[in-house]
Amino acid sequence: MAEIKNYCLNFGPQHPAAHGVLRLVLELDGEVVQRADPHIGLLHRATEKLAEHKTYIQSLPYMDRLDYVSMMCNEHAYCLALEKLLGLPVPLRAQYIRVLFAEITRLLNHLMWLGSHANDCGSSTMLMYTFREREDLFDMYEAVSGARMHAAYFRPGGVYRDLPDSMPRYQASKIRNARALAALNQNRQGSLLDFIADFAQRFPGCVDEYETLLTDNRIWKQRTVGIGVVSPQRALNLGMTGPMLRGSGIAWDLRKTQPYDVYEHMDFDVPVGKTGDCYDRYLVRVQEMREANRIIGQCVAWLRANPGPVITDNHKVAAPGRAAMKSNMEELIHHFKLFTEGFHVPEGEAYAAVEHPKGEFGIYLVSDGANKPYRLKIRAPGFAHLATLDEMARGHMIADAVAIIGTMDIVFGEIDR
């Protein structure tokens, strides 16, 4: 009787390291991975098809729910594609606000990735550290949109509203004494820009804390150095983008190579790795957090000095202001028509891509002249990255497969769509 050497193991979909609903069928020789077969589709919600039955504005909130860790970056790509079709100019202040919140979103994403990736590899402390900073970033989301996650803040032609002049404050309660309350509200006395500036000033110290815990940690290096190595040419051939591509040594960043909004005016560097392993991708993302913080500082300085409109004055696309709507019946009718019937987009097609925290996130829109898209195609970076898992995991131990899944920073909202 022949000896059975290899056996199959189901990893997920209810596994804490699966980062969502990944079902991974692993063929193992002992603890060594011989083949990894990802099964996707467990979070499929037909977003692309739904968009064909919704007006252009009604489709916007669906974008938040694709990669639900990088909400506004998804909206950004959708709005850019729609503005291309409409030939719609965006006010300069709105562009700066978009870039500001795109980088805030990058920090949100990378903090989530760092905490969960380290937790998967056995360092649960990192999760507590990173979520401490994420709370402040969510407060920024809440201040402009009223929602802590699914903001729907970016709009075709600009953003929903200007930055508020005050920050919400913590109220007195039985669980906080006056001293604790004063400490919580210390940096909330001014405007949202003051709050963001305060965060940007202290955030580099937080990143230093993360690096103290991980960068030279012997166990962390043993779990990541030499794991999941991808050569530069192979990374290109596999369709990798974002930190996955830059970790292999290729300095491709859409904010530099194909700048959109006001990224050409921003001063920042593009970090790249050398060996293309999990450790290099970790270093790239950590440095990206520092660079994103630099961009946030530049946006805050410009926005303080330059007031102006934050959405286009094209009333066929932009909704009237609340004050006008409450005092003028025509404005109220216009608002109602815009949000029920929507606006018609000229016939044509457009592709817009942004440097999403996970890679190149693209939206391909086809219009037939109606108030709904004829076709909406989403180019999700995680889809291409997950397809490389089999190649990256072969020959590694099963515990290393967890580190490789973590380094990909995958979210199934965008992969399954």
From Swiss-Prot:
<dbReference type="InterPro" id="IPR029014">
    <property type="entry name" value="NiFe-Hase_large"/>
</dbReference>
<keyword id="KW-0472">Membrane</keyword>
<keyword id="KW-0997">Cell inner membrane</keyword>
<dbReference type="InterPro" id="IPR014029">
    <property type="entry name" value="NADH_UbQ_OxRdtase_49kDa_CS"/>
</dbReference>
<dbReference type="GO" id="GO:0005886">
    <property type="term" value="C:plasma membrane"/>
</dbReference>
<protein>
    <recommendedName>
        <fullName>NADH-quinone oxidoreductase subunit D</fullName>
        <ecNumber>7.1.1.-</ecNumber>
    </recommendedName>
</protein>
<dbReference type="Pfam" id="PF00346">
    <property type="entry name" value="Complex1_49kDa"/>
</dbReference>
<dbReference type="GO" id="GO:0048038">
    <property type="term" value="F:quinone binding"/>
</dbReference>
<keyword id="KW-1278">Translocase</keyword>
<comment type="similarity">
    <text>Belongs to the complex I 49 kDa subunit family.</text>
</comment>
<comment type="function">
    <text>NDH-1 shuttles electrons from NADH, via FMN and iron-sulfur (Fe-S) centers, to quinones in the respiratory chain. The immediate electron acceptor for the enzyme in this species is believed to be ubiquinone. Couples the redox reaction to proton translocation (for every two electrons transferred, four hydrogen ions are translocated across the cytoplasmic membrane), and thus conserves the redox energy in a proton gradient.</text>
</comment>
<dbReference type="InterPro" id="IPR001135">
    <property type="entry name" value="NADH_Q_OxRdtase_suD"/>
</dbReference>
<dbReference type="GO" id="GO:0051287">
    <property type="term" value="F:NAD binding"/>
</dbReference>
<keyword id="KW-0830">Ubiquinone</keyword>
<keyword id="KW-0520">NAD</keyword>
<keyword id="KW-0874">Quinone</keyword>
<keyword id="KW-1003">Cell membrane</keyword>
<dbReference type="GO" id="GO:0050136">
    <property type="term" value="F:NADH:ubiquinone reductase (non-electrogenic) activity"/>
</dbReference>
<dbReference type="InterPro" id="IPR022885">
    <property type="entry name" value="NDH1_su_D/H"/>
</dbReference>
<keyword id="KW-0813">Transport</keyword>
<comment type="subunit">
    <text>NDH-1 is composed of 14 different subunits. Subunits NuoB, C, D, E, F, and G constitute the peripheral sector of the complex.</text>
</comment>
